[in-house]
């Protein structure tokens, strides 16, 4: 084995691991290993990748790298391994100046299988031209075999970025970084600008790989209960002296941006999703310090919390209550993902030429903060939030180990100390001392903002025709290319399309890839243990979990909904809980109190179908805090639930407008989810309720606040108040999750809370199912489509068949048809046993009618039994990996509590998992035949101009 030199070893008792930092001397690359008792093993290899333009070369390379390698000569090893392993996470990330390839699994055999595939992919990829065309960009005729049809650009990344750059948040971010970093790679769009992607060549892509995907430019990160030396030997054997060390002086690094002499003014157009979003937006952004310096990083986080944590924070208060705009911007606060730290503040809903007013408002605010400083209460609250953030094992979509590893990445990327970025106790202690020193925080305000010339003032200008202009420009380019093509060139293009389609349709030799068998999968899984806390005839539920010193709490109440007006009122009320005042506190005081004792109090709603098929629902408030604040936070949660004040019409209007803007900006990123919910809502009662709560139909509830029509607002608030007055009739439930048991004194205090111990949920609103095909316009450059059918609920004996069918359709049919051939960024099938719906969807899709036809064809394909036992095994592995995927300790407890409350006991879930493992081919064919024989609903959100119809 090559020489791995141990550079450093640090015990991190706060987060429960020992960090080891190794140097592989042969290549001068580092291995960061976080040793702990976690069964979820995580690996990540990261390369510095520094693009010179916005062709998306790093992004397209990330995709193409995973399309076959020297050892694994199959077209799509990445997606194949998703279903041949028990991975709890597999992905690849392209950032502004790095590319990473992470995975996680709880199976050690699986870990080394995936390690083999990943290392072969990044170091020895095939990078074939057909894969470049499929994943990046290509020219094709709209009708592949007819050169008389329109010429089109296709490609997975091309369509992904058309969708991405339709989103105002992404457009704003690119505008800010372009102007903040005129000399650095950050000025480019590493994902790719659609108009520039088509300039990328296959040869340039291969050269980019050769330059950056080298062991000397790599850092390896690992986490879990696995020996570092075992991993190091595997990496050594894989590399096998096939590379020569590149001296550090020859490697490329991102340098510091030169200081500005004066702030920069900039203007950029953006694409509003709808006419309601046509207001201007104004921003100011500063570069502060460097992300790999733990002291600068913590200082910046503390200042960001002090300024923006809640409505009582001085800068956030100004952004909410000024007379220039209607709400704080969606992009707000500290960004620490690059070498330079960036702080952003902004407002939405302004008028033209408001930038100077906004700049003066911000300058005045910082001058006042420097003069007055922060109160002791504000400082303690911000430090408390830092402490909570440090301790929390969050329930992110990323594995916890990967979250920790990514937090250390700046130290490795910029040749600093990665271990210092995770072991922050010493730096945090020093920051706490400094924060209370006179003038310290005011000096940071001056240094970061007042005296800092490294600032961009950006005006975002709405243009409802921006998408059409881009499409017209692209059409002119394509028509020009076509008019200059010879007959032979057109024929070659037709033949190239046929060749690519034949390649996509060819059956790969999957057996070259490693895989698990069912006997590698545990027969059963473990669940968190629960117990009831005896109080006074009411028993809160308690889970003792390793929460790293935090306590999590949830208080919930049964819902009674008898009309669509009730659903709309619930949506509004949920957005207001904790954000408006209570009977005894105005909203500023309430926000301040919440921040002092907790990590925030958040409202959510959950609906489910019980065993009898009836829809039930609950509203919940949840929080996290240090154990000493258990009683105080619980009392505050019940105060909010029972005594919220709904009289401050101005505040409510501000909050609802903020919610609307956030909702609008989520549409492009989550268009497939809106389409699935919309399609299911046409024929399924539970989905109908959910769609009116959080789908596009919910926009109607925002209408009075967007138009600011006083009479409409008054009328709606009257309905909300009426609904709220009946809310407390529902039964209360309470949950605690902690590694600290509640003391007898705390239980005594909780006894004094006014609980409602009786009641039941009843969602009885009228619903008339229908099956329709609906197309709705959406101002983006791509489409989102979904189809939905009735299916059995969780408790039905045949339910496991549909779970496997959905996985089979996604992996074996829709991935090929919708993504590879159709060019969509994503597509698949999803069975929801909790609502009783079976859905198919596409994401950032250039097509829509053809995609719906593919959805229909998938069921015919499955009903004919056009799959083998190996396909079934892969589908089972894919499903079981989702079921077995661990969450955070608190997340596991929340999930168990919710399912138990829905009569899905641990025993029933264990049996359900067992039944999934026993599904046969005949079962799958039977399920497909039943679905195929049904009517379905379909919804497409499309950029095409079509006759439209409302969803409901």
Task: Label the model's feature ranges.
Residues 1-42:
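Non-catalytic terminal extensions that flank enzyme cores
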Residues 35-37, 44-46, 158-170, 248-312, ...:
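His/Glu-based metal-binding/catalytic segments typifying zinc-dependent metallopeptidases
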Residues 40-50, 76-124, 131-142, 170-195, ...:
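M16 family metallopeptidases and their MPP-like homologs
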Residues 154, 160, 171, 175-177, ...:
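Hydrophobic, small-residue-rich alpha-helical packing segments that form membrane-like cores
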Residues 154, 206-238, 687, 715-750, ...:
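Non-catalytic, conformational "gating/processing" segments within enzyme and secreted inhibitor domains
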Residues 942-948:
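Conserved small/polar residues in nucleotide/adenosyl-binding loops
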């Amino acid at each position: 084995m090559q020489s791995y030199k141990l550079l450093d070893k640090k015990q991190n008792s706060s987060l429960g691991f020992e960090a080891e930092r190794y140097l592989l001397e042969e290549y001068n690359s580092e291995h960061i290993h976080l040793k702990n008792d976690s069964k979820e093993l995580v690996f990540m290899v990261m390369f510095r990748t520094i693009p010179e333009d916005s062709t998306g070369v790093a992004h397209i390379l990330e995709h193409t790298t995973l399309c076959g390698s020297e050892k694994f000569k199959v077209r799509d090893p990445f997606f194949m391994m998703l279903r041949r392993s028990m991975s709890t996470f597999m992905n690849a990330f392209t950032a502004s100046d790095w590319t990473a390839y992470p995975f996680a699994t709880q199976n050690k055999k699986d870990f080394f299988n995936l390690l083999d595939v990943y290392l072969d992919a990044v170091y020895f990829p095939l990078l074939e031209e057909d894969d470049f065309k499929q994943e990046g960009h290509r020219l094709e005729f709209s009708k592949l075999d007819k050169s008389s049809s329109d010429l089109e650009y296709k490609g997975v990344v091309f369509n992904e970025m058309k969708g991405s750059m339709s989103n105002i948040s992404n457009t704003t971010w690119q505008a800010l970084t372009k102007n903040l970093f005129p000399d650095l790679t950050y000025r480019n769009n590493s994902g790719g600008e659609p108009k520039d992607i088509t300039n990328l060549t296959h040869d340039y892509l291969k050269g980019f790989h050769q330059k950056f995907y080298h062991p000397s430019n790599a850092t390896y990160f690992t986490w879990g209960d696995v020996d570092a030396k075992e991993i190091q030997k595997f990496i050594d054997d894989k590399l096998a002296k096939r590379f020569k060390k590149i001296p550090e002086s020859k490697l490329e690094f991102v340098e510091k941006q030169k200081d500005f002499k004066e702030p920069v003014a900039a203007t950029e157009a953006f694409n509003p999703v709808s006419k309601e979003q046509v207001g201007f937006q104004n921003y100011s952004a500063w570069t502060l310090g460097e992300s790999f310096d733990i002291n600068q990083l913590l200082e910046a986080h503390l200042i960001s919390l002090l300024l923006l944590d809640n409505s009582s924070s001085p800068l956030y208060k100004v952004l909410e209550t000024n007379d220039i705009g209607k709400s704080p911007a969606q992009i707000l606060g500290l960004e620490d993902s690059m070498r330079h730290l960036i702080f952003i503040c902004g407002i939405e809903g302004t008028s033209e030429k408001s930038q100077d007013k906004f700049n003066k408002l911000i300058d005045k605010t910082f001058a006042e903060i420097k003069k007055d400083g922060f109160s002791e209460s504000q400082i303690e609250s911000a430090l408390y939030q830092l402490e909570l953030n440090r301790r929390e094992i969050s329930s992110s979509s990323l594995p916890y180990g990967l979250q920790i590893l990514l937090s250390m990445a700046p130290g490795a990327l910029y040749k600093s100390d990665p271990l210092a970025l995770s072991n922050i106790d010493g730096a945090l202690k020093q920051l706490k001392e400094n924060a209370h020193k006179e003038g310290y925080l005011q000096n940071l305000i001056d240094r970061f903002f007042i005296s800092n010339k490294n600032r961009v003032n950006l005006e975002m200008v709405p243009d409802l025709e921006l998408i059409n202009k881009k499409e017209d420009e692209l059409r002119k380019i394509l028509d020009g290319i076509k008019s200059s093509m010879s007959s032979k060139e057109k024929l070659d293009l037709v033949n190239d399309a046929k060749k690519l389609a034949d390649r996509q349709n060819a059956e790969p030799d999957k057996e070259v890839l490693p895989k698990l068998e069912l006997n590698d999968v545990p027969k059963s899984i473990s669940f968190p243990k629960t117990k009831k806390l005896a109080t006074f005839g009411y028993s809160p539920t308690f889970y003792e979990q390793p929460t790293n010193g935090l306590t999590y709490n949830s208080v919930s109440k049964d819902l009674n909904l008898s009309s669509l007006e009730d659903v709309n009122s619930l949506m509004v009320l949920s957005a207001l809980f904790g954000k408006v005042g209570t009977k005894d506190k105005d909203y500023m005081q309430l926000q301040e109190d919440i921040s002092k004792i907790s990590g925030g109090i958040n409202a959510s709603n959950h609906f489910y179908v019980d065993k009898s098929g009836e829809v039930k629902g609950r509203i919940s408030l949840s929080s996290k805090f240090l154990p000493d604040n258990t009683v105080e936070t619980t009392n505050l949660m019940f105060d909010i639930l029972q005594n919220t004040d709904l009289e401050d019409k101005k505040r409510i209007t501000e909050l609802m407008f903020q919610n609307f803007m956030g909702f609008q900006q989520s549409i492009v990123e989550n268009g497939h989810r809106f389409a699935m919910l919309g399609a299911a809502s046409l024929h399924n009662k539970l989905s109908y309720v959910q769609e009116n709560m959080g789908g596009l139909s919910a926009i109607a509830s925002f209408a009075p606040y967007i138009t600011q029509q006083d009479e409409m607002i008054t009328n709606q608030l009257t309905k909300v108040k009426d609904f709220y007055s009946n809310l407390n009739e529902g039964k209360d439930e309470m949950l605690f999750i902690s590694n600290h048991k509640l003391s007898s004194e705390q239980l005594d205090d909780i006894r004094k809370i006014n609980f409602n111990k009786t009641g039941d949920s009843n969602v009885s609103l009228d619903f008339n199912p229908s099956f329709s095909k609906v197309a709705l316009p959406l101002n983006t450059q791509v489409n989102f489509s979904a189809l939905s059918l009735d299916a059995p609920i969780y408790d039905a004996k045949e339910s496991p068949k549909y779970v496997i069918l959905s996985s089979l359709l996604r992996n074996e049919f829709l991935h090929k048809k919708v993504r590879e051939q159709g060019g969509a960024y994503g597509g698949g099938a999803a069975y929801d046993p909790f609502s009783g719906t079976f859905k198919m969807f596409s994401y950032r899709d250039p097509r829509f009618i053809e995609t719906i036809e593919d959805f229909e064809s998938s069921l015919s394909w499955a009903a004919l039994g056009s799959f083998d036992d190996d396909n079934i095994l892969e589908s089972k592995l894919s499903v079981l990996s989702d079921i077995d995927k661990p969450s955070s300790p608190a997340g596991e407890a929340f999930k168990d509590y919710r399912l138990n409350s829905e009569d899905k006991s641990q025993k029933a879930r264990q049996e359900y998992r067992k039944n999934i493992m026993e599904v046969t081919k005949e079962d799958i064919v039977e399920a497909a035949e039943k679905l195929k024989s049904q009517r379905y609903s379909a919804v497409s959100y499309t950029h095409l101009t079509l006759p439209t119809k409302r969803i409901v």
